[in-house]
Amino acid sequence: MSDPVRITNPGAESLGYDSDGHEIMAVDIYVNPPRVDVFHGTPPAWSSFGNKTIWGGNEWVDDSPTRSDIEKRDKEITAYKNTLSAQQKENENKRTEAGKRLSAAIAAREKDENTLKTLRAGNADAADITRQEFRLLQAELREYGFRTEIAGYDALRLHTESRMLFADADSLRISPREARSLIEQAEKRQKDAQNADKKAADMLAEYERRKGILDTRLSELEKNGGAALAVLDAQQARLLGQQTRNDRAISEARNKLSSVTESLKTARNALTRAEQQLTQQKNTPDGKTIVSPEKFPGRSSTNHSIVVSGDPRFAGTIKITTSAVIDNRANLNYLLTHSGLDYKRNILNDRNPVVTEDVEGDKKIYNAEVAEWDKLRQRLLDARNKITSAESAINSARNNVSARTNEQKHANDALNALLKEKENIRSQLADINQKIAEEKRKRDEINMVKDAIKLTSDFYRTIYDEFGKQASELAKELASVSQGKQIKSVDDALNAFDKFRNNLNKKYNIQDRMAISKALEAINQVHMAENFKLFSKAFGFTGKVIERYDVAVELQKAVKTDNWRPFFVKLESLAAGRAASAVTAWAFSVMLGTPVGILGFAIIMAAVSALVNDKFIEQVNKLIGI
């Protein structure tokens, strides 16, 4: 866990936001609290923030500031305020984004409220109501979380404004009276910020209290094993929240990696320049001497015109050339650490400046020779200092490259960890989504069975009301017998059905059949498909349900033309795996809602019986009196 970052206010308790431990979240909520990175350190040493004794009445405590002091302070204040302004802008951007999320959260909460009202008004299942109640609690907590986040950003804004005023008060260009006025404004803004801190802290505490209630509610649901979808929804929402937070963190980590990579590139360029500078210094004549005096001796020579005037005997001008040569490491080191005079005396063993009667001339020549060594010494010292400075710059650059390399590694490791977390979240989400889909499938399956049972019961009731108890019992018995059975061949079915058809034609004429055909034209294809699916479920048909409205079309043609083979061929193709229950389900779905009358009922039931069990044809005959 990262260390809490705090807003430090003199004389007031601080409000701390822990970016991990206090992250505003609930079962499905991941609201990022404001990152209080503006005030993680103390104000500049020169700041009057928390130290209002810098003014002594109407006079400066210290001596009046110099122009240099004023300009230095101006630069410090400008740099400090620029930093605060950038952080304030970032804070405002975050607040704006939080405001957008709050608006979306309010809309989501209102939608959940309306959905819950609709479910309650419609007498929905208790599980669905429980699930929606839990969703509403989540939505309410999310909304409050964003309000808490915004309160934190508002507190940060006030703190920043306070520090800017304190910084303005520290200008050396204003009078003590003006400074005092600014400090009073800053103190007022600071007090407002502290009040905002308390408000945000109270809201955060309230948020945690509400979150605890929601967590407890979730635990109860999990413990009781009820409202499985509500539990899975909560787990899904939690992971989605983690995913959102992870995506933001990945974006920040990538930006961080890009930034440190650019810093590393800059550091490497600086190292290259430092190495080039060192090479350049070492390749100068004097630089070469510093590196290898044996290979590149250091030389210096000067032409002189020395005037001698003291002794008339030697009066005149002496023209000489002084020279100095360093061609080994020992002499070089000695010269660099001693004077030219010491070198001449101790290394060259030239201790006596006067060697002739011309004392004045000898001394001036000696001094010129000493000066030549000092001249060479200074050149070599300058070269050595430049090389040393370049080497120091290289060491510093290498250290910087090493630090930036480590920083890049840490940033890359952090990004990889977040990417790994992202994949883990994705995997968990996939698992949760699969479980949710399975729970919904189970719920839909249960609801479909309920609907199928109700539809079948309503169908039998309708048959009873329209055609009597015998017809209703016939439908029930045929449905029962068809379950788990296979249909006969088309030829066998036609043979059985022809007996019924021949008897039927003796009693009913073409006008009766045309009335049935007309009724079949009124079949609602959509309703038929829905009913077929439910009847199939009720009769235990587990194969793939195929919508075959064209079978009903063939039925209509057969009734009209009395040519039944095409119909039976189509009906056979309907029964996947030759399942008799599919044929029965189709027949019931055609008759439900279609005014086929007792004759149409008899024809359809006889056709199904011919395919399933022709013993029922006799019952159909009795039903219509043939």
UniProtKB/Swiss-Prot annotation:
Origin: domain of life: Bacteria
Chain segments annotated as transmembrane: 588-612
Keyword Transmembrane: yes
Sorted UniProt keywords: Antibiotic, Antimicrobial, Bacteriocin, Host membrane, Membrane, Plasmid, Transmembrane, Transmembrane helix
Pfam family, any one: Colicin
Residue ranges, annotated region (Disordered): 276-308
Main location: host cell
Molecular function, one GO term: pore-forming activity
Cell compartments where the protein resides: Host membrane
GO CC terms: host cell membrane; membrane
Biased composition (Polar residues): 276-286
GO process terms (BP): defense response to Gram-negative bacterium; killing of cells of another organism
InterPro entries linked: Channel_colicin_C (IPR000293), Channel_colicin_C_sf (IPR038283), Channel_colicin_cen (IPR014740), Channel_colicin_N_sf (IPR014739)
Function field: This colicin is a channel-forming colicin. This class of transmembrane toxins depolarize the cytoplasmic membrane, leading to dissipation of cellular energy. Colicins are polypeptide toxins produced by and active against E.coli and closely related bacteria.
Family: Belongs to the channel forming colicin family.
Official protein name in the record: Colicin-Ib
Organism listed in the record: Escherichia coli
